[in-house]
Amino acid sequence: MVINDFTNTNFVILAHLYNEKNNENVIKTTQDEVADKLQLSRVTINKAFSLFVQNGYLQRDLKHVGRYYLTDLGCTVVENIRTLSVEVNMLSQKSLIK
């Protein structure tokens, strides 16, 4: 059992956005590009983006239509879940060895 068994599509999308951000946390990837890359529907991506904005993980760029910023909170969520994933996987490996 690994942490991926417990993460959902929204985290996969948020983690992808984290990987796509530049050093100013700007995400220049469009929702269509995210949908294609992750092989998810455009509707799924749009719902996730709306949820992320609502919860403070993403912020719309008011000067550029369709551009978003990953907030500090969004970055922290991804980093913490990734850290937790490593720890859970290490514990899982230890339990398999015993």
Positions of PLM-derived features:
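Minor-groove-contacting beta-hairpin "wing" of winged helix-turn-helix DNA-binding domains
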Residues: 64-72
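A short alpha-helical element within helix-turn-helix/winged-helix DNA-binding domains
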Residues: 27-37
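Short amphipathic alpha-helical interaction segments
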Residues: 8, 39-54
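Short alpha-helical segments that sit at the start of domains
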Residues: 1-16
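A short, conserved structural fragment
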Residues: 53-63
